[in-house]
């Protein structure tokens, strides 16, 4: 079931659901909107019980592979310690295992990498974006 939750409410309830994997485990999960997520080893994902009407937001520490269900009215956002990855329906991997660095690899579709200090960097399939927390720079590699 869907609920009408605004952004500020989402932030407060996101702590209610937390899924963690450890050295010897990984995990696949599917959200109510059809988005699939694979959590790699030593990863924590925080998420709301239900996505809101304007956005779908999760919080990641570690590495996860996302197969995001298309929804042009509700972008999917992955928030990390260094910035945000935003998209509307695509497949990508986010890795935050190295402190101060977020790596995003796009498999198909398009995503934007948004450093905490502002700016937006779009990447294409096959590209790797590396966000450095100390400088807030985003580097693209092919």
Language-model features: locations:
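The conserved beta-strand core of Leucine-Rich Repeat
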Residues: 7-10
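Single-pass transmembrane signal-anchor helices and their membrane-water interface zones
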Residues: 1-5
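Conserved alpha/beta core segments of nucleic-acid transaction machinery
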Residues: 132-142
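Short, small/hydrophobic-biased targeting/export segments
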Residues: 13-133
């Amino acid at each position: 079931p869907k609920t009408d939750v605004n952004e500020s409410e989402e932030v407060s309830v996101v702590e209610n659901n937390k899924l963690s994997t450890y050295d010897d485990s990984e995990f696949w999960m599917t959200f109510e909107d059809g988005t699939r997520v694979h959590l790699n080893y030593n990863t924590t994902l925080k998420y709301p019980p239900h996505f809101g009407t304007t956005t779908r937001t999760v919080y990641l520490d570690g590495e996860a592979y996302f197969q995001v269900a298309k929804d042009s009215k509700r972008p999917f956002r992955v928030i990390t310690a260094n910035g945000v990855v935003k998209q509307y329906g695509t497949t990508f991997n986010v890795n935050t295992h190295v402190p101060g660095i977020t790596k995003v690899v796009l498999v198909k579709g398009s995503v934007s990498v948004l450093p905490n200090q502002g700016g937006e960097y779009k990447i294409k399939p096959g590209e790797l974006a590396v966000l450095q927390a100390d400088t807030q720079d985003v580097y693209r590699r092919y």
